[in-house]
Amino acid sequence: GIRDRSPSRGLADVYKRQVLLLTIGAGGGLKQTLLDAGVSQTISKVAEGAHMPYLLLAWLIAVALRQATGSATVATTTTAGILAPMMAGLAATQSSLVALAIGAGSVFFCHVNDAGFWMVREYFGLQLKQTIWVWSVLQTIVSVVGLIGTLLLWHFLT
């Protein structure tokens, strides 16, 4: 602190927590803005007309929102809000698998419009191209494997 002239490590920890809370709060705020603006109703109407399997639909919407906003938090919360009315009649197992598909879609191809991309780049001291090849490709693999695993679970559990 100031009196003993020691570095204030505690302040750095508080700052990290504040940034995390602000990011989550901003993600929730953007989600609500998208819902209030009618984006969710438009996507729901298109989704209902697409006649797609629930898991693929959930994954694709989450991917689209992740790419548009750069935030996995926004992609997750907004996709869940959009699909909630359509998924109301699903069994608990099916709802859980839809949530997993949303989570998998929300991490698809992290790129320059995502704060996490820049954090990884700085933390590991990577160049932009390296970050795309390492982090973005890894995130895409995680997302696709997550979707495949969720589809397999749907096949065997429902």
Which residues fall in each region the model found?
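Helical membrane-embedded segments and adjacent short helical loop/helix-boundary regions
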Residues: 12-24, 35, 52-54
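Alpha-helical membrane segments and immediately flanking helix-loop junctions
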Residues: 65-69, 75-83, 95-128
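Single conserved hydrophobic/aromatic residue that forms the stacking wall/gate
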Residues: 1-11, 15
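Hydrophobic alpha-helical transmembrane segments of multi-pass integral membrane proteins
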Residues: 25-27, 50-90, 102-103
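Structural signal for alpha-helical transmembrane segments and their membrane-water exit/capping regions
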Residues: 3, 26-35
